[in-house]
Amino acid sequence: MKLKALSVAVTVALTSFTALAADEQETVVVIGSALDQLVQTEINSDTLEKKQASDIKDVLNTMPSVTVDGNARYSRKVYVRGMEDKFAVVTIDGARQEGQLFHHSGDQAIDPAMLKRAEIELGGNSALSGSGAINGSFSYETKDPSDLLKPGESIGARVKTSYQTAYERFATNVAVYAKVNDKLQFMGIANYSEDGDLHIPDQEAVTSKQGELKSGVAKVVFIPNDANEFKLTFNRYNDGGKRQLSGEKAGALYADDEHNYHSLNRDTVTLQHEYDAGSDLVHLKTNIYYNRQYMERDVLVDTAWDKDANGKWIKDGTIAIPDREYNVTTIGGDIRNISWVGEHELTYGLDGYKAEQWIDAGDGVYQSGSKQGETKKYGMDGGTVTAYGLYLQDMYEFSDFRLTTGLRYDVHKLGGVYDGDFDQLSPKFKGEYQTTDNLKLRVGYGRLFKGASLPETLTMKAAADVKQSDTKAMTGNNYEAGFDYELTRLLAADYAILGFTAYTYNLDNQMHPTKNNTTLANQYDVEVWGVETVLSYALDSLSVYANHSYSDGDQKDLDNGKTSHMSKTGIHNFKAGFNYSLNSEFVFGWDSRFVPGNDYTDEDGEQVKRAGFATHNIWAAYTPTFAKDLEMNIGVDNILDKKYAEHTGFGISWGSDKYTSYEAGRNFKASIAYNF
């Protein structure tokens, strides 16, 4: 079938910039969109290895319309098209990452050392992205044993060590992998990384954000026959230390404090099955998962607070607080089938999950003050979400058109300390028109729906303290239009493409999880608009990318009806880079960003100014032919030692230099790895 053959060709094209078979004259014929190409060439294990990626900022830093702020690993927050990733669907090996543990920490907890690749969908126009995809979706996939085994190998191991100066980050990585026979493969990867002082230009070293990352993945792949494949994966992420709790705040605020231990953790178990016997009607993919995100905090003696007769907070002695564990678990699954009916590729299925939050802790005891000897409960149960969706997507090609239509029916139910039932039927559409051999026009639409998410876990309230408002679902519309223009012949390149997208979306009854525990209130009606331009180019041993993105937005306060500028928007972002293979042994590259200064008027009428900045990173990788099992990488991030802060960051986004968390300065990094 014409469409099926085209789909296979596009998949091959997106796997690499240029595909060369044993016959050097064979090249890729069909090319995906400019954005797809950028994602697949910049977010894969090989590229991330060469650039020595060590946290989520390194993974996403080349993407248009995506900003990652925060200068410590546990403080990284991700913003997409003007809003936080709380309005995107994030999965790791298909497991949804639900809930917010703490509003001063990030929640995309994945170690690049485990990462194979990612799929990124900007906007909410796909029926396959899952329930609640407003501004996009991030689908991360961990490595397989076959990714590490070399041709002809049945067993292997790899040891790597690295160091980064700006974070005083020392890391060691060990991997073991094996192919028992044609049916069974397994692997294990363990990574240990220790951060010391954080170095920022023109400031004292930050001593309050030190920590240790312990992460790992274990995977078994079972292929009983040509039609079936099973993958069982366990992934753990543990990032902790005696450090300031509020990771996104400036370190100088806590330089002289004594810090207690806390950690941000994730345990994920997934079982994936794929059945494909070559039938046009049955290509079944099933995924079930358990995901637990949790924060651990040690015992401490702290100030006890109470309200006086006027409702003002006052100090009232001290209280001994026990160990606490803040939990969000998500159990769910997705079963989908792909059928070819004539020229139609139909994808349909059912997905669902249940998310639950609670605090596991003993009682605190007042040590002094008016309540001396009394106890305070810290353990409690919170809210639950039960959600499921039915979806259908049809991709159909005729003449010079490709139409992708979809429907999702989502049901979202609140439980535990909250109540609410929400549902919506959401149509989705993507249209492509190949006007010439080079030019493809694109349009898209998605009806948006997101039920009320669980609020922040750290600030949970007991059931007696919850006074829920008339909580509504978040709904809206997403519109997009753009083009992809192939420039391969015009530029005499192996491959070149330019893409442009303009978008606008609105979200009514927007609500953010931060401190929204008592009322679970809807807060704003928002409207965001923006543009994205992406260029990818390859010739011989040279690959180049460049992109620009901009978003702007307004929000209407549902309490007072006042409209104001959205503080995470109004930002131009230019990104560019290249990599060049000097020979079979040596490859080097450069990545650059430029963010112009900007200003806006906040909801109080105050002018907020954000200073512009430019940063440059360089890197190189060396694999000597005399020792092919040896790999060496060097690099320098922020080579000009620029003092800057991401415009979406805490403090700078609302005009406070005191709270602004500036990014790391010049960062020399090096690694060496050996394969056994």
Regions found by a protein language model. Give the residues of each.
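Acidic, small-polar-rich N-terminal luminal/periplasmic segments of exported/outer-membrane proteins
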Residues: A22-G152, E168, G247, T268, ...
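Membrane-embedded beta-barrel scaffold of Gram-negative outer-membrane proteins
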Residues: T161, L281-V301, L441-R442, K472-V531, ...
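Surface-exposed extracellular loop regions of Gram-negative outer-membrane beta-barrel proteins
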Residues: N238-K242, S246-A252, G369, K413, ...
